[in-house]
Amino acid sequence: MLSLTYIVGIASALVIILLLVGLHLPSVMPDNEKLSAYECGFDPMGNARLPFSLRFFLVAILFLLFDLEIALILPYPLGVVFSENTFYNYWLVMLLVVVLTFGLMYEWLKGGLEWTE
């Protein structure tokens, strides 16, 4: 328990230090030259700010969610080996899988996984 207290204390101190450093650093003043596109000293060939596909963003967010699911399920075998309450752990993992399966079905039925616009 003492090591957890140390970790929380160090993390809190690090957050406070980074916030204070960020407040005291000079802010960057954007001007016309900094906002313009730069291609090795030549005039840009086209627009540097292309429109971003919202579908791609949605698929990327879904990938992150399901990647997080895998990261949460990976420690499950260790929980089975080192825990006496495996029945509880099993149902927690099954609940996580069921919730994410329903979320995937919802996205699929709403057309969130269709790539064409």
Swiss-Prot record:
Gene Ontology MF term list: NADH dehydrogenase (ubiquinone) activity
Membrane-topology descriptor: Multi-pass membrane protein
Subcellular location as annotated: Mitochondrion membrane
Transmembrane annotation, as ranges: 1-21, 56-76, 86-106
E.C. number: 7.1.1.2
Pfam family, one: Oxidored_q4
Top EC class, one word: translocase
GO cellular component, one term: respiratory chain complex I
UniProt main location, coarse: mitochondrion
Gene3D superfamilies per UniProt: NADH:ubiquinone/plastoquinone oxidoreductase, chain 3 (1.20.58.1610)
Disulfide bonds: none
Keywords attached to this entry: Electron transport, Membrane, Mitochondrion, NAD, Respiratory chain, Translocase, Transmembrane, Transmembrane helix, Transport, Ubiquinone
Record carries keyword Translocase: yes
Reaction catalysed by this enzyme: a ubiquinone + NADH + 5 H(+)(in) = a ubiquinol + NAD(+) + 4 H(+)(out)
Entry annotated with the keyword Translocase: yes
PANTHER family (UniProt xref): NADH-UBIQUINONE OXIDOREDUCTASE CHAIN 3
Function comment: Core subunit of the mitochondrial membrane respiratory chain NADH dehydrogenase (Complex I) that is believed to belong to the minimal assembly required for catalysis. Complex I functions in the transfer of electrons from NADH to the respiratory chain. The immediate electron acceptor for the enzyme is believed to be ubiquinone.
UniProt similarity note: Belongs to the complex I subunit 3 family.
Name this polypeptide is given: NADH-ubiquinone oxidoreductase chain 3
Species of origin: Branchiostoma floridae (Florida lancelet)
